[in-house]
Amino acid sequence: MASENVFDVAKKLGYWNGKEPFKFWKAYSGKNYSGQLKSFSTREHFILNALAPSLKLDYEAEELPISVKPDKQVSVTDVMALLRETYEGTPLDMTQNLKVTVKDRKTGKVDTIISPKANPWMRGDELNMLNGIKKGVVKSVRNIAVPQCAYSTVIQLRNWLPDAVGGVVWFSMDNPGQSPRVPVFCGITDFPAMYKICGNHRYRDDAALWHYRRANKLAAVRWGTARKVMEKNIRHFEEKGQRELPFVEAQYQSILQSKGEEAARAYLTDYTADFIGATILRWDEMANQYWIESRFGF
């Protein structure tokens, strides 16, 4: 969508000569947010390439297609995994050079591993310090999962089911690479109080965001160690949501038939609230454990 004078303004301001094919991105920006003369960034290239590797999309190209047809059917959990991406194990991995040698206490075997202190969400001052010690040891990359994220969604729509239960927003607060996703059905009529409060401008214990963020930030301090528990809990709630989804759909339909729409929607509302409560409790427990593990210092 654009205003009717989109071409005229581009000509008047010298952004487009009127002879070449008009490209909005080139006329009104000409570069991505990293200043590169292209229409896309690392994140777009990574996701499109992951979905359609057969296209062999070239990062050195000036532009990419706005969308691609995936090589195979994409599941909801596939999309969730993409939104957690930090390019680990690829040439874009920010932690790949942050290695230490460790010695096994029992065998005496020495190995080189990524430092437990390394994490893919380092602030600029950390990057500057590390690159000051050894130039180029860390290259700043815009990950798909970023710590400044307020929330992210994976929207699942099934037209063969009633709208109230066929539409599910898999919702996550804070960093998508560290937080769980909760199923928010289109038919719910209310949210838990903590989900109605914004915590982005100041710390609030009554805002759900900070119950996730507290554990997430503490985990990043020693990510190599803390991630084991956090990723296990992320998987737990992802698998729980997928496993229980058919049951919830059946229950909704049964209640709808026997008690009516209001009761059926109340069931969905309660289910979402219970799911949210379970994730908050688990992330609070993790944060407390991370504090204990940090009692001798970070």
Which functions belong to the PLM regions below?
Residues M1-F298:
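C-terminus-biased signal that marks the final domain/tail of proteins
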